Amino acid sequence: MKKNVAVIGSSGAIGNAVSKILLDDETVQSVYNFSRSISTNTSDKENRIYIDIENEESIKDAVDKIPQDIKFDLIFVATGILHNENDVYPEKSIRDISADKFKKVLMINTVGPALI
């Protein structure tokens, strides 16, 4: 039986690489790619669904777009943040830690994936 796979965070480097490998795998029936960046499907077995793991409503909306009869054989979570272009970066001192930055990192790296 062919597998159904979900890749959460498929627009990042790791998620995108995993998705490409799965799309080329003949034992995989369908790949559901979840990300904030939605583009055109590259394969008949690919399904792209918008998700923002910092937003609980977005997670619920993404789940609602999965057909009821789909059961995933593998869920690969490739979300995460160490730094971004704005205000989140690796702390070099305890003074660099702020509540807002800490909340953002926890939401993306821990809470969001747990809600999925």
Where are the predicted features?
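A conserved hydrophobic alpha-helix of the Rossmann-fold in NAD(P)-dependent oxidoreductases
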Residues: 59-63
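Conserved catalytic-site loops of classical short-chain dehydrogenases/reductases
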Residues: 73-76, 103
